[in-house]
Amino acid sequence: MSAEVISAPLTPVEKWLDGAALSSIYSSSYWNDIEEEKSKEWWIADGSTAAFARLEAYLERSGLMQSYRIAEKFLAGLAERDLLVADLAAGIGWTACLLSKLPNVSSVHAVDISEHRLEQLFPQAIRMFDGVAGKLKRSLGSFYDLRIADASVDVVFIAAAFHHAANPLRLLSEIDRVLSPGGHLILAAENVVSVAAVVRRMIRKLLHERKLCTNFYELFPPDDILGDHYYRVSDYYFFSQLLGYEVLNFVVTRPQTATVILRKSVS
């Protein structure tokens, strides 16, 4: 990586979507609600030390950073150099910034549907995490419709966002399109519903509704507001089989949080 690239300034946000197209995306109004965002731990727009400390504490407390470190250790150990990474639903860009610091990563393309996160918070995240601005690219767009060439990305990284996909199979199909043969899909800090959680909800439903329910999707329906899905370990393995990907690592870091690393077939 040349010194010119490393020292290059952050380029403007590339806008794949106009206002009308953005507003048509399910849940985009929630992710673009600035007033709502101001109450969140990741609101670091003022660039203050207090804001950074609050975000850092949240990332540690929530297990997000622990999950990210598992993914980072894996990526840092890859023999491949000049990796091209797509960070989907990148949010404020904390993962993209950390990924940009890895010596074997040449660029990180951060995609999100939240304009203020990309425009206002992302530059502050670069400061906070010492991100390499010259390696970073930001695009306002949907992860269902990536303006990225076929088989051109070495790593697709998604942190705590895969479950937000109202149509997970459509998202996986788009990921498979842009991921190069032998490339890796990393799902960090994703929800994984334990057997104990299923049993507890079955008992609760039995007690309150006098109904014995064994249907997982009835016990854990998608969230009404965001469309969030809930997944079991078996669901992630089903997704991998559907894609024909190999499961390289599946680490449950907390009772309901997992890091999943998949590899696409080379053929």
Ranges and model annotations:
Residues M1-A53:
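N-terminal, positively charged/glycine-rich alpha-helical extensions of SAM-dependent methyltransferases
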Residues L169-P181:
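A short glycine-rich, Lys/Arg-flanked "PGG" loop and its adjoining helix->strand segment in the class I
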Residues N191-L243, N249-V252:
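C-terminal alpha-helical "lid/dimerization" subdomain adjacent to the S-adenosyl-L-methionine
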